[in-house]
Design a protein with these regions (language model features):
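A short, hydrophobic C-terminal helix/tail in secreted or cell-surface proteins
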Residues: 2-4
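Extended alpha-helical targeting/anchoring segments
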Residues: 7-8, 12-175
Length: 175
């Protein structure tokens, strides 16, 4: 993820060794997760820039063909949690998250979606999502921290992500 919007920042961060190393790690995690149940795992596109109101994402798509003997539900489960929200190595990263974060993530980082009667699947990771609980609206954002992270930059990235949600609240209040 590239956390700030602007062409100069976009060009600088697309060449940033830390951002690139983080992205390579996440693509490798996705390839590994899919390889448990798929063959012909491939990267369909790699490091495309996608622009949003408050952030710019480096996006890659990894896909595979489900093995004939594989259970589709197990294949789905084996991809969670997404490496983009856990880090690597996945199991140890999740243990550290559990120890260090002050509360359970709740819906954040899980998924929402549906399985159609025809076997189709459509799902999304629940990030930058509002959850209403007991009359209180909850939302949260996070960022990937790696050895070469800059604390101020990572905090700015999280604030940029939250900015889109805050803007949505402001717009809803005007309706």
């Amino acid at each position: 993820l590239i956390g700030l919007v602007g062409s100069e920042m976009c060009i600088r961060d697309s060449d940033d060794p830390k951002e690139n190393a983080e992205h390579v790690m996440l693509v490798d995690l996705a390839r590994n997760d899919l390889s448990r149940n798929c063959h012909d795992v491939k990267v369909d596109f790699y490091k495309e820039m996608q622009y949003y109101s408050h952030v710019i994402h480096l996006v890659s798509r990894v896909s595979g063909t489900l093995r004939e003997e594989a259970d589709p539900v197990k294949a789905f489960i084996d991809t969670f949690p997404a490496g983009t929200l856990s880090g690597a190595p996945k199991v140890r990263a999740m243990q550290l998250i559990s120890q260090l974060e002050p509360h359970n993530r709740g819906a954040y980082g899980g998924c929402i979606g549906f399985i159609g009667l025809n076997g189709s699947l459509n799902q999304a990771i629940t990030i930058r999502t509002f959850v209403s609980r007991n009359g209180v609206l909850w939302f949260q954002a996070g960022g990937g921290i790696v050895a070469k992270s800059n604390d101020e930059y990572e905090l700015q990235e999280v604030n940029n992500k939250l900015g889109a949600l805050k803007k949505a609240i402001e717009m809803a209040e005007k309706m």
